[in-house]
């Protein structure tokens, strides 16, 4: 869920 951290 890296997208949740904007990575």
From Swiss-Prot:
Keyword Secreted: yes
Cell compartments where the protein resides: Secreted
Entry keywords, A to Z: Amidation, Neuropeptide, Secreted
Leucine amide PTM sites in chain numbering: 7
Transmembrane feature ranges: none
GO cellular component, as recorded: extracellular region
GO annotation, biological process: neuropeptide signaling pathway
Family: Belongs to the allatostatin family.
Record's function text: May act as a neurotransmitter or neuromodulator.
Protein name: Carcinustatin-2
Organism, as annotated: Carcinus maenas
């Amino acid at each position: 869920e890296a997208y949740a951290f904007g990575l």
